[in-house]
Amino acid sequence: TVLLVQPNAYPKVIQIGSALEDLQHAVDGDIEAVYPFEDSVGVICNEEGKLRGLPANRALRDEGGHIYDVIAGSFLVVGLGEEDFCSLSAEQIDKFEALFHQPEAFVRMGHSITAVPIPDSVLQARDEHRDAPKLTHSSHDDR
């Protein structure tokens, strides 16, 4: 049980295999594991996400709340076992779902990047538009 964090979406708790191919599929490419937190968790992201132009997803911040990196593309938050990745505990799921809950948009201002939370209303409107039935136009007259 891990957390999948996709761009412009709320995190999802998912079940995933621990094979390399499973992790690569989840992040759409070769994986890179980073360990930005004191907790026994890792972040698995696409190694070439920025180079491939994957959408900016979430910011990583230091203790002072300053952005030091932005993850591009989907990523996983996974538990750390003695020798490999493992499931997150319920407490870890709660903590990191809260940390990464709100999708972010990014704005470059001079030499820095600012993360702006995407309001729930914008996400809901997008989802409603995406889920709305599509109207089709007939190419002939039905009279």
Regions found by a protein language model. Name each.
Residues 130-143:
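Non-Sec secretion/translocation targeting segments of pathogen effectors
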Residues 1-129:
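N-terminal nucleophile
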